[in-house]
Every structure is written in structure tokens, then in C-alpha cells.
């Protein structure tokens, strides 16, 4: 079974006039040589390749997220950052939300934070909240904003406690 995400350090060859291969193609070839055959590279990541590859001397780390049939490259970083491989595990309860920062290589929980689910302001149980959202279209937005506010608060707490920004977590489970 493949993991949810992987960080792969690549030491790419410098481009030459004799082998005019794009940075994207060089990355794809290096990943294919390691067994990652179907990698989707979105435009947002492609835009980062130049000048990052050159500034890093073509020593880069790519973060891949496994999808059903392929991998998606979600980040590219200078140097070897493979030891900084994190994910978020969330227990989204009706009254309490618990969020853990997990080291994806060791499986260790680095930190755990929890908060009252912000949706409880709109009903103490799920059925009350469903009824509330059906009363008016703007109520759905209020419930959604309460959820986002709670999640953002927990992400900030994790970053403050550990010094690890949630942006370094390619996966939330």
C-alpha cells in the first residue's frame, strides 16, 4: 500500500546545450526512474520550477500526494527537506474538533490540540444544525464560516506550539 504522501529528494543534472530538456521533463524522468510513473504537476507548481531549480543547483525536494490512480506534485522546495514530512489528522466531532500534527515518516504525533466545534453556536446537536441551515441560505454560510474559524484556530495553535506551519502538511486526514 502506498502512503498518502511522499517527499522525494532529487539531484537533477544541470541543463546543457547538448541536452535541452525542460526542468519539468527532467523532474518527470527522475521520478519515473524511482517508480513514480504517473505524476500530475499543476500549473501552480510548474511556475515555481524556474528559478527555484537553478537557485538550488538542481537539488530539490518534491512533495507528492497519492490519488486513486496517480500522484500529484503539490510542492517543490530547494535542497533536501525530506525529514520535514508532516500531515494533519482531524477528528471532526459534533461538539469537539481534535487536530494532530503527525510526522509522516515515524508516525509520531508531534502535537495535539482541540477546540469546541464552532458549529455548536447554531445548535447543540447535528439535527438542530441541519434544521438551522434549512431555514435560510445564509445560515449554511454561517455554519461553514464557523467550521473554517475553528479549523484556522487549531492550525494557528499547532504552528505556535511546534513552529511547523500547516502549509508544510500536504495531507489532512
Where are the model-predicted features located?
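Short glycine-rich, Thr/Ser-proximal phosphate-binding strand/loop in the N-terminal lobe
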Residues: 101-141
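Extended, hydrophobic alpha-helical segments in both membrane/secreted and soluble proteins
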Residues: 95-99, 109, 151
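N-terminal catalytic scaffold of extracellular/periplasmic and nuclease hydrolases
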Residues: 133, 149-153
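Nucleotide/phosphate-binding catalytic cleft detector across ATP-hydrolyzing
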Residues: 1-89, 94, 106, 140-148, ...
Amino acid at each position: 500500500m502506498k502512503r498518502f504522501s511522499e517527499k522525494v529528494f532529487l539531484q537533477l543534472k544541470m541543463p546543457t546545450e547538448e541536452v535541452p530538456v525542460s526542468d519539468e521533463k527532467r523532474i518527470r524522468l527522475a521520478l519515473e526512474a524511482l517508480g513514480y510513473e504517473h505524476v500530475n504537476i499543476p500549473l501552480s507548481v510548474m511556475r515555481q520550477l524556474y528559478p527555484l531549480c537553478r537557485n538550488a543547483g538542481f537539488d530539490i525536494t518534491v512533495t507528492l500526494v497519492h490519488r486513486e490512480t496517480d500522484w500529484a506534485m503539490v510542492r517543490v522546495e530547494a535542497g533536501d527537506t525530506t525529514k520535514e514530512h508532516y500531515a494533519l489528522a482531524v477528528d471532526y466531532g459534533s461538539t469537539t474538533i481534535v487536530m494532530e500534527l503527525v510526522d509522516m515518516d515515524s508516525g509520531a504525533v508531534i502535537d495535539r490540540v482541540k477546540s469546541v466545534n464552532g458549529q455548536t453556536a447554531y445548535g447543540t446537536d447535528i439535527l438542530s444544525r441541519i434544521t438551522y441551515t434549512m431555514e435560510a441560505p445564509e445560515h449554511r454560510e454561517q455554519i461553514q464560516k464557523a467550521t473554517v474559524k475553528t479549523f484556522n484556530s487549531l492550525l494557528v495553535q499547532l504552528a505556535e506550539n511546534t513552529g511547523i506551519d500547516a502549509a508544510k502538511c500536504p495531507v489532512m486526514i
